[in-house]
Amino acid sequence: KKTDASRVYGIEFEHMLSPRNLNFLVNHASLVEEHIAGIPGDIFIQDYLPKCSEVQKAQIAKEYVKFNERCMIRLLGDMRSYNYVVIPIHDFDQVIYKIRAIDFDQQSYEGKFSVYRPQFFKENRAMMDIVRAKLKTDSITQYKIEERSTISRRLIISDERMKLLLAIMKDDTVSLKENVISLKKEIFRFTNENSFLDCKSMGDLMEKTLKYLKRNYQNVSLIDLI
């Protein structure tokens, strides 16, 4: 693939913050990334989801809550159903499902916060339907806290690498100035955290977001999934 800033930052954040590492190589204008095997989300929703058992649908709903939370926290945009895969894992007498992003070129670019929340894309409506059908509010809260806790632990593990990446990103022009201004205002409205208003770049926003997460990962009342 052709190298661009958003995609490289997106892959770096995926490698450090997601449950699974992602191997990749950048050489000048070329980018080689590890293939992520799985069923494209749009195909899964159309051909596989209707055939899943009720237990499997509940497990998929749980994974989707965590995936949605992960994308929102790390500002990975445009996660429509064709930009992620659903991975079936056979475990003795059952099949469990994991969800992973496969397209990272909308990392920290758009100015609308909703773009970083997969739940709002019409292509993902079927996933949101099973979340509403299968999970109670308390369960959604629990899974959001679990995901935030996991990301916080991964931040500690990758502390030095993350600091270096954010230092570079803060000095880089990843997006348009008006997108930064719009996004920081929207995030401020959700968090009431004044420090977001001081951000001058998408790198600043990512740094403030991750610091805010580590301080407040148990506070899920700010943003509702349903």
Which residue ranges define each predicted feature?
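C-terminal catalytic region of ATP-dependent kinase domains
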Residues: 93-226
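Short, low-complexity, polar/charged sequence segments that are solvent-exposed and flexible
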Residues: 17-21, 51-55, 118-123
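AlphaC helix of the protein kinase catalytic domain
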Residues: 43-50
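Conserved ATP-binding subdomain of kinase catalytic cores across diverse folds
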Residues: 1-42
